[in-house]
């Protein structure tokens, strides 16, 4: 490998608290602009911040889930910069003494399992939302100003765009399981900035770090990193130098575009936040928070493999969403062939419906009807293909499985005497296929099974038909 890709991520996650981080204003997306505001989040004279305790609790949960050290003491800082989205002229954040430090998240990397290190998870406040009009005006909605955020800062351990996407998918799934954020990128409750550069492994030369913003999807993150890697390789190969810059991702053009020279920490003139006290949290308080945490995806995967005997890959799919996992376990209480259940959920249910953690997942028919269908397949009352036909009609009409099976006449023929009669007829009518089979042409058997199914109008049990054909072909 001539070039090594070096990627770090900065992920901002809005927390789903009822009120903002430092005032009692409602934390609610989509409300009428500038209705959830007060002297504190508008920085009017006399407005003083008071920390929302749930912000601390939620951050401790995230830190625990991502294997961080939870610090008993942490402090807030002021990040100074002038922009209309911050009326104070500074953002309340945590710079050098965050509540959660030194964590990691393990993912399936490009070369196997890999731990992506985390520098820290810090508490901070969000900024107002800028709205640009066709008249070239910029309007500000301060409803978002002061909404609680956690910023998750990774170490530069990510080696490709794909690894970054996998990391973000797992991080989002974990946060959703914790129920501390809805992680909707389209609403801005999960945002990601990328820092990327490359190193020539032969000379040790590195390119300057580029920060990429305006990434509104995980696929966009992956593509932006891949684009920047190629751009940085060209910089090295052409012996061009570039200072640290901030660029934005243009999804339509599939390229990054220069925004500005990148700020450094000194540009923000970080200073301690004097209006907020040191955050103290005891080991007992941390334990109380951790004890109330729900089962996390990795824990659920281990349990699914152990309790249900399904593959780790299948368990990973089923544990990718709280609602999907709940759906599987509800069905597993009454249907014990867990592999068949898992396969049908993944191949037939998930391609028809999108399961979201925002609302309880329900089929357009009762769960017991789906179990009735699976029992019919398992007992070989109907074939697998017939089962797919039945499920399709169940989704279209909401009718029960048995009702559709009976109405369409899909019950398999299992009478061996009846199937034997059809097999004999097929063999008598296809002498050439018998010759082909004896000459070792495997396709001949498939053709003969197809003829049996055709004569039986799809009702013959294909397993019985196949076994009977092989037996009779050997006898001829």
Feature map (PLM): residue ranges:
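Amphipathic alpha-helical core segments of compact helical bundles
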Residues: 16, 195, 199, 230, ...
